[in-house]
Amino acid sequence: AQHAKKMRRFYERLVGRQVSFPDVAYDSQRLAVSNSLSSEFQVLAQAVNRLSERDRRSRDFTLGSIRRALREVVACFPIYRTYVDAGRGTAADVAAVDAAIAEARRRNPAMETSIFAFLRTVLLPPAGADDTRLKVAQRFQQYTAPVQAKGVEDTAFYRYHVLTSLNEVGGDPAHFGRSVEHFHAANR
């Protein structure tokens, strides 16, 4: 871990540009959404759009704006999937959704922020949410796993080679090594 900066600088000189794994993963996940998994994405976006039309606060969002915001949230999703049900989600699930939305907002400052607030209510359905809203949330949860697999494992891992041994399923090429304490804590 102590030589991570040196290796990154060497890699950047080798490829001729500054590159970070989170950016490569983001671009690769956007590619997966737009190409390999686009039909599933269109079905999901249509379902989210139908939800938006049911509420006066969100009915002015166009299908196009929902697609753009949803694509960004999916591309920024930090984990394979969440397991959220109406009003019930672990702190980790809520944190993953909030992190994805925050990163999507950061990467797209010109996008209307209220659409991200609406998407949060879709992805984290409140207690008492109706079956339609729950099904849309579940569809999103089922969609993010193949996007992660296709975007990160099958694409980003083949585009980012600072230290190839980090590019394994379950690995994170952005992090070089762990402390002994972290290793023992993970094995408890």
Predicted segments, located by residue:
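Alpha-amylase-like alpha-glycosidases and glucanotransferases acting on alpha-linked glucans and related
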Residues: A1-G89, V94-R188
